[in-house]
């Protein structure tokens, strides 16, 4: 019989977990890859520099970053009256070679190599929509064919074995408070390129059943999820140390990662890994060389992190202030600013990864092999 999954205590002392450093982490170095400071877009009050980088993806050798420019989670105007996010295309040297303004707050960004375009979701809390961006061309707006049944917005996007999967973020914003069994946690998106609409169907719901993945007495038990904050998602690579080939959803405030085996098939199965801290984006290095690119929303920069990576390790942007139990004044004691961490895929414990170079508060993350 399924039961609700209560917090699994992985670390007895949270502060001790925060202080721990991943072995070999001192070999990692950060450097500034790009900044929005010298890139401008037009607003009702004139030209202003773009700001608040968030999601990040790559296509055709270039890197694409969504700058939210202070727009609110339902598309509300920034303090300067701006209503648009800006997606910027950077070349390998960090030079801006293209940009597109999108109406609303861009929260999700991913490449669709099959069509050679970038997909962007708009407004994480409500009044959501979507854009397809053609490199060297225009951004085309798409509306959802029906109101989202999760009564919220949309966030991260993954292309998983040909399926476009989108997180149903901020469930219950315009309806009953989450969790609700009828609220989709992840949507399958189907595009009508003639009508410029997207049909959204549930992949699984906020109260779907899953198997506990953490090592310990509860491992293997079936539980009912109670997701309140579906956020980032990923296609777990085949070389990952665990959950290889799965689709993964991060429920940020709930401190959980949901792994879906056989996503989209008739007999898909879910596993839940409880984390010691909340996380945003996750990346799995493919080998010791390459680079991890991460946005820093607080510093308006994109950083490049290099070093000797462990193949298949699970790196994450750790976001203590986004936990459901975070204090209203944050950062604060026990709730530091964002940091780069490594997740133990068996226990869910997170250790801090030490960096030399400029301080980084990671958010969106992307690993690129050489």
Regions found by a protein language model. Give the residues of each.
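Bacterial N-terminal signal peptides that target proteins for export
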Residues: 1-9
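Sec/Tat signal peptide C-region and signal peptidase I cleavage site
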Residues: 20-24
């Amino acid at each position: 019989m399924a039961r609700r999954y209560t917090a699994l205590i992985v670390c007895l002392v949270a502060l001790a977990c925060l202080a721990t450093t991943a072995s070999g982490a001192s070999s990692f170095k950060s450097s500034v890859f790009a900044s929005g400071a010298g890139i401008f877009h037009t607003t009702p009050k004139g030209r202003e520099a773009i700001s608040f980088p968030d999601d990040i993806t790559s296509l055709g050798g270039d890197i694409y970053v969504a700058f939210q420019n202070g727009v609110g989670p339902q598309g509300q105007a920034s303090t300067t009256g701006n209503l648009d996010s800006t997606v910027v295309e950077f070349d390998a040297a960090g030079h801006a070679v293209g940009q597109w303004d999108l109406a609303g707050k861009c929260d999700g960004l991913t490449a669709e190599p099959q069509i050679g375009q970038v997909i962007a979701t708009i407004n994480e809390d409500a009044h959501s929509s979507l854009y397809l961006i053609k490199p060297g061309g225009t951004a085309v707006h798409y509306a959802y064919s029906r109101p989202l049944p999760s009564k919220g917005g949309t966030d991260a996007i993954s292309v998983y074995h040909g399926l476009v999967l989108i997180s149903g973020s901020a469930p219950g914003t315009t309806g009953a408070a989450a969790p609700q069994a009828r609220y989709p946690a992840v949507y399958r998106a189907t595009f009508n390129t003639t009508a410029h609409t997207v049909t959204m169907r549930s992949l699984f719901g906020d109260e779907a059943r899953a198997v506990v993945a953490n090592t310990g007495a509860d491992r293997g038990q079936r539980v009912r999820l109670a997701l309140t904050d579906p956020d980032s998602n990923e296609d777990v690579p085949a070389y990952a140390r665990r959950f290889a080939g799965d689709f993964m959803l991060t429920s940020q405030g709930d401190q959980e990662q949901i792994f879906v085996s056989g996503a989209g098939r008739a007999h898909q199965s879910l596993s839940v890994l409880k984390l010691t801290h909340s996380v945003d984006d996750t990346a799995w290095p493919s080998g010791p060389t390459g680079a991890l690119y991460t946005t820093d929303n607080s510093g308006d920069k994109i950083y490049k992190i290099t070093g000797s990576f462990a193949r298949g390790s699970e790196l994450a942007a750790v976001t203590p202030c986004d936990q459901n139990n975070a204090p209203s004044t944050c950062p604060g004691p026990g709730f530091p600013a964002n940091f780069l961490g490594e997740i133990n895929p068996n226990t869910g414990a997170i250790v801090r990864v030490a960096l030399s170079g400029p301080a980084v508060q990671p958010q969106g993350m992307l690993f690129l092999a050489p």
